[in-house]
Amino acid sequence: MKRYPTKKIFVGDVAVGGDAPISVQSMTFSKTADVEATVEQINRLHFAGADIVRVAVPEEEDAKALKEIKKRTSLPLVADIHFNYRLALIAAEVVDCIRINPGNIGSKERIKEVVKACKERNIPIRIGVNAGSLEKEIEAKYGATSEAMVQSALYHIKLLEDLDFTDIKVSMKASDVERTVEAYRKLRPLVPYPFHLGVTEAGTVFHATIKSAIGIGALLLEGIGDTIRVSITGELEKEIEVGRAIIKDAGRASEGLNIISCPTCGRIEADLVKAVAEVEEKTKHIKTPLNVSVMGCVVNAIGEAKHADVAIAYGKGSGLIMVKGEVVAKLPENKLVDRFLQEVQKLAKEKE
C-alpha cells in the first residue's frame, strides 16, 4: 500500500513527511543538564544510525544546557517539554523542534507563546499526545480510548492552525498496541501532517520489540507513518536497530540485506545458527539492498536460492554457493561462509 501523502516538514536537515524516507529517532536517558553524558549518548545514537534525537527538558538547567549540547553534536535535536511552557521558549532558541504534550502544556496563551518562539526560528512543533496524560475534560468525556487521543490531537492541531502555524507533526502513543493503532488510523484521513509513530512505555527489549513490530509495523504496512521511535527501556542502540528492521521488513525501505534462514530441524547437518550469526555480523555494514539465503538442507534451499541474490545450501559436510539461482561452487562446510561473503561483497559493489 502506498504511503499517505503528508506535508513535508524539516527537523534540522532531516525531512519528515512527503516523499522523505521514514526516519528513526530515539531519546537520551541522561539528565540533560549533564552535558558530557548527554553528548555521549547522542553520539552513540548517531553512530548507531539515528536520524533525530530527543532530550528531556524538565528543568531550567536542562533548557540552558541545550546550547552547549547543540554545539557538540550534529543530529537534529528535539526538546521534550511538559508542564512548563517557559522551558520551550528557552529551548526554541537552539533546538530543531519542540515537542509539547497537550495534556499538560497549559492554556491557549502559553501555546501562543510557544508558537511565536518556534515561528521566529522556523522550527516545527510536535503535538505529542500520550494516553497517560490526557486533558481531564477530554478523558472525562471519552474515557481511556483511542477517540480521546484523537480529539486531543485535533483540538491542539486547530489551536496551532488558528495561530497560522502548520509546521506540525503528530504522535498519539499508548502503552497498549491496539489503542495506539486505532488512534493513528482514525486521525490519518483527517489531517495532512506527518505522523511520528511509537508505542510508549513498551518495556524491555523482548516486549518492546514485539509491541513495536506489531503496532508500528501494522501502520507502516497501511501506508501510515513518517518517522518512528521504538521505545525500549534503557537500550539506545537497540531502539535504532529494531526501528530500522521494522521499516525494512514492512517494505518501507530497501537498505541492507534481507537474510532468509530456516528455523532448523532434524535434517540439518551443519551449525546453521553459527553460520547465520556470522553472516549477520559481517554484512551489517552493507547498505546495498540484497536478498540472501542461508539454508540448512536441500528441501527448501534450492527454491529459496532461485529468489535470492546469493545463497548457501548446506549438506552433510559440504554445501553449495548459488548466485542468482545458479550453482557457482561446491565447498567443504568450513569454506562456505567465507565464499558466500565474497559473493555478497562482489554483488553489492556491482549494484552500488
From Swiss-Prot:
Q: What keywords would UniProt list here?
A: 4Fe-4S, Iron, Iron-sulfur, Isoprene biosynthesis, Metal-binding, Oxidoreductase
A Pfam family hit? GcpE
Superkingdom of origin organism:
Bacteria
Q: Which reaction does it catalyse?
A: (2E)-4-hydroxy-3-methylbut-2-enyl diphosphate + oxidized [flavodoxin] + H2O + 2 H(+) = 2-C-methyl-D-erythritol 2,4-cyclic diphosphate + reduced [flavodoxin]
Instruction: Please give the Gene3D superfamilies that the UniProt record associates with this protein.
Output: Dihydropteroate synthase-like, Sulfite Reductase Hemoprotein, domain 1
One record GO biological process: isopentenyl diphosphate biosynthetic process, methylerythritol 4-phosphate pathway
Instruction: Please name the pathway.
Output: Isoprenoid biosynthesis; isopentenyl diphosphate biosynthesis via DXP pathway; isopentenyl diphosphate from 1-deoxy-D-xylulose 5-phosphate: step 5/6
The record's comment on cofactor binding reads: Binds 1 [4Fe-4S] cluster.
InterPro entries (UniProt xref): Dihydropteroate_synth-like_sf (IPR011005), IspG_bac (IPR016425), IspG_bac-typ (IPR004588), NO2/SO3_Rdtase_4Fe4S_sf (IPR045854)
Q: Name one GO molecular function term.
A: 4 iron, 4 sulfur cluster binding
What residues does [4Fe-4S] cluster bind to?
Answer: 262, 265, 297, 304
The cofactor required is:
[4Fe-4S] cluster
User: Which EC numbers does the record give?
Assistant: 1.17.7.3
NCBIfam families (alphabetical)? ispG_gcpE, PRK00366.1
Q: Which family does it belong to?
A: Belongs to the IspG family.
Q: What does this protein do?
A: Converts 2C-methyl-D-erythritol 2,4-cyclodiphosphate (ME-2,4cPP) into 1-hydroxy-2-methyl-2-(E)-butenyl 4-diphosphate.
Task: Tell me the protein's name.
Answer: 4-hydroxy-3-methylbut-2-en-1-yl diphosphate synthase (flavodoxin)
Designated gene of the protein: ispG
